[in-house]
From Swiss-Prot:
Disulfide links within the chain: none
Keyword annotations from UniProtKB, A to Z: Ribonucleoprotein, Ribosomal protein
Protein name, per record: Small ribosomal subunit protein bS21
GO CC, any one term: ribonucleoprotein complex
NCBIfam families according to UniProt: S21p
HAMAP family recorded: Ribosomal_bS21
InterPro entries: Ribosomal_bS21 (IPR001911), Ribosomal_bS21_CS (IPR018278), Ribosomal_bS21_sf (IPR038380)
UniProt xrefs under PROSITE patterns: RIBOSOMAL_S21
Entry's family note: Belongs to the bacterial ribosomal protein bS21 family.
Domain of life of the organism encoding this protein: Bacteria
GO terms under biological process: translation
Gene that this polypeptide is encoded by: rpsU
Length: 71
C-alpha cells in the first residue's frame, strides 16, 4: 500500500496526484481488476500462454521490419 506524507503547505490536489501516481506504479488498480473475479488456474495459464505467444509474434514482426528497412 503506497503511503504519501503530505508536505507542509502542499495543496490537496498535488498530494492526491502523488498518491495516484504511486498507486499506478505499484500496480494496485490492475491487481484489483485482476482479482475481481475468480479465474481458474487452467484459464489463467491459457491466458498467460496466449499473451506470451502474442508478445513473441510482435517481437518477430518488429525484427523483420528492422531488417527490411535497413539497406
Amino acid at each position: 500500500m503506497p503511503i504519501i506524507k503530505v508536505r507542509e503547505n502542499e495543496p490537496f490536489d498535488v498530494a492526491l496526484r502523488r498518491f495516484k501516481r504511486s498507486c499506478e506504479k505499484a500496480g494496485i488498480l490492475s491487481e484489483v481488476r485482476r482479482r475481481e473475479f475468480y479465474e481458474k488456474p487452467t484459464t489463467e495459464r491459457k491466458r498467460a500462454k496466449a499473451s506470451a505467444i502474442k508478445r513473441h509474434i510482435k517481437k518477430i514482426n518488429r525484427e523483420q521490419l528492422k531488417k527490411s528497412r535497413s539497406f
